[in-house]
């Protein structure tokens, strides 16, 4: 008799995607982050829905509604901190997922990679809007600085900013539309994630060696489901530890001060996961140039498949490329550190050098290293 998972139309889809899915036999723990991202997304939607039931998207009551959630709502404090720290965990998993894609050459699965970039942009947009909602000092000034960047667009910039604001300054209409978009975007992210998986299952997963595994596959369940559950337990342990022992470790103290348009904080900065892009923005003295560099720092990921010059897909057997990959990680960590600091010397110069090195490493050094490695292969 045919098992129900193979005959029922709905269960059949789940079976093909998560149970009988043929998978390479040598996937490492780096392949866990896709399922962890799904877990983080589900957690964010559940906690977000619970918070939305008590939140008031109006400048006069937004800050107090957050205080009300934290103090008066049953388990409101843990819901709020799970949501805030869950976003940090989501971005950690996201960056590691992208890093794995770069290291093992998964970007050569073009459709999957490009939808992944769209997911990254959408997640960053959602997170930025979520940062504005508590209506603290950093929420208000962060929103002012970031939305003002659009005024650098020639001709339509000023009108575009006023259209986003819903007036001549950030006020209740801005907060209402940000809340609406912050609520709806995660559901669009789920739809895009489904398309991401659809394209991935069309080609099959890449593997650490970067070679075809068509001749040797294993079932996804129970091997990789067990592995994913272990990753999920570790993720939940880290999230629970962070939320229960140090919930404000990754938050900004200025956001516990109600938004005041007449009082600018000494150092305006976004959440930690945007700091690398924020440093690149700050490194260029020209406003339009800074905005272009900011967008290019993310969109450069779309150019990586075109910059792949190696005869091998994975970096596993390419020491020069490995060195440049870890150099790139060091540059990104440096950019994150500089973004969290005020604009003073010598930090500004370090930020400018790191920003320049970020683009040079990806656009010039990595393709060059691949060509050198191709020539070295001829001598072996």
From Swiss-Prot:
Q: How does it assemble?
A: The cytochrome bc1 complex contains 11 subunits: 3 respiratory subunits (MT-CYB, CYC1 and UQCRFS1), 2 core proteins (UQCRC1 and UQCRC2) and 6 low-molecular weight proteins (UQCRH/QCR6, UQCRB/QCR7, UQCRQ/QCR8, UQCR10/QCR9, UQCR11/QCR10 and a cleavage product of UQCRFS1). This cytochrome bc1 complex then forms a dimer.
What gene does this protein come from?
Answer: MT-CYB
As for subcellular location, the record says: Mitochondrion inner membrane
Annotated residues that bind heme b b566 are located at 97, 196
Q: What is this protein called?
A: Cytochrome b
Lineage here is:
Eukaryota, Metazoa, Chordata, Craniata, Vertebrata
What keywords would UniProt list here?
Electron transport, Heme, Iron, Membrane, Metal-binding, Mitochondrion, Mitochondrion inner membrane, Respiratory chain, Transmembrane, Transmembrane helix, Transport, Ubiquinone
- Keyword Iron annotated: yes
Its main localization is mitochondrion
GO annotation (BP), single: mitochondrial electron transport, ubiquinol to cytochrome c
Q: Which Gene3D superfamilies match?
A: Cytochrome Bc1 Complex, Chain C
Cofactor: binding comment: Binds 2 heme b groups non-covalently.
